[in-house]
Amino acid sequence: MQRRLCLSALLGLTAVAGAQAPAGRPFTLGRTYQLASRALGTTLSYQVYLPPSYEDAEYAPRRYPIIYVLDSPGAYRLVTGVVDYQITSAALPEVIVVGISATSPERDYTPTHSLIGADGKEASDLRESGGAAAFAQYLREELIPRVERQVRGTGHRTLVGHSLAGLFAYHMLLTTPDLFRNYLFVDPSLWWDRREIGRRAQAGLSPPIDGGVRQIYHATADEPPSSLFDPTEHNAANRELTALLEARRSPNLRVLVQHFPGERHGPVAVPAIHAGLSWFFRGGAPPFELYLDAARLSAFHRAAQADLGLEGLPAERDVAIMAPYIMAMPGRRAEAEALLRLNAANYPHSARAHVQLADFLLSAADTVGARTALSAALRAVPHHRPAAARLARLAPSGRRAAPQKQGR
């Protein structure tokens, strides 16, 4: 029976392989770049995802937190998928994502030289292990400076690492703790070299020396023993270090440890990355009800976003998206108007914010207010065509125009 099923599957794959895929345009999340590294003596690639408003000229330029993801392009695809969906759902502030590639994870991510693998046996592919110091130099002196000259970052950085990449992320925490604000560890390979990272953490894990806030999210899986791998040492090393993390927790060193029952070492990255990023950026995504009160929304951002390196203002794009929803709610036009006026005041150089306010005022037949908003749009961007066209259509000053539908 099993043989027939395998044969049927093979024949099905053969039929599919012979079919011509329909023509279409590639769909990608980001761009790939090359960087020649002196520290590593080779050229590596890195990927960059930009959030929706970054290249939209209709929004005022701003800066964004940056998430650096080890094990690119695989882990980068996962993180950008999660991030892009959460941004679209207004569950995460807009961020930049950078994928970091390594030529040999067994060399680049391991802090010490060791020939002993996860199964406790000697492994020939570990002969070049112990290259983490050089890879850390590449990140610190070459990649991060290059990226942050290339994009508009706030200086607020997050590092994400899974498995051996999580081991390397701990190496970064212990050697250059102030390089990143957030550290997201997914079931890291802390068994390495007889728990070498755990021994170093006993002496070296402390609150940040720059006086800022550091956040650590550590996720663990529920890997069962198998003929290929006994996770006993792996799990014990993770329990040992997470206990230390929780003991060292302080106002400046925030820690969240989360175990995922039933999730194995590889797939646990999916829920862990979603949960970790949501926790890190919880201050950047206000609940919907705050958009019904412009004053409370502003207070939320002033109080919560300092840790994110943001401006402390509601994001222009988020307000632009939420305002029409609120306007469509029965009896909420006043709240929508307050939100649009807040956006225009917060982003005076954005023609889009002024035009959106003008459209709202025109829908209420407030020609005078709309004229004022459109004039502000043209002061911000003198040749802004949508603003100029709307202003030209307005009746002479003092007359009331017929209500118009909202448009861009």
Which residues are covered by each model-predicted region?
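Hydrophobic h-region of N-terminal signal peptides that target proteins for export
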Residues: 10-19
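Non-catalytic cap/lid and distal C-terminal segments of serine-dependent acyl enzymes
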Residues: 20-364, 376-378, 382-397
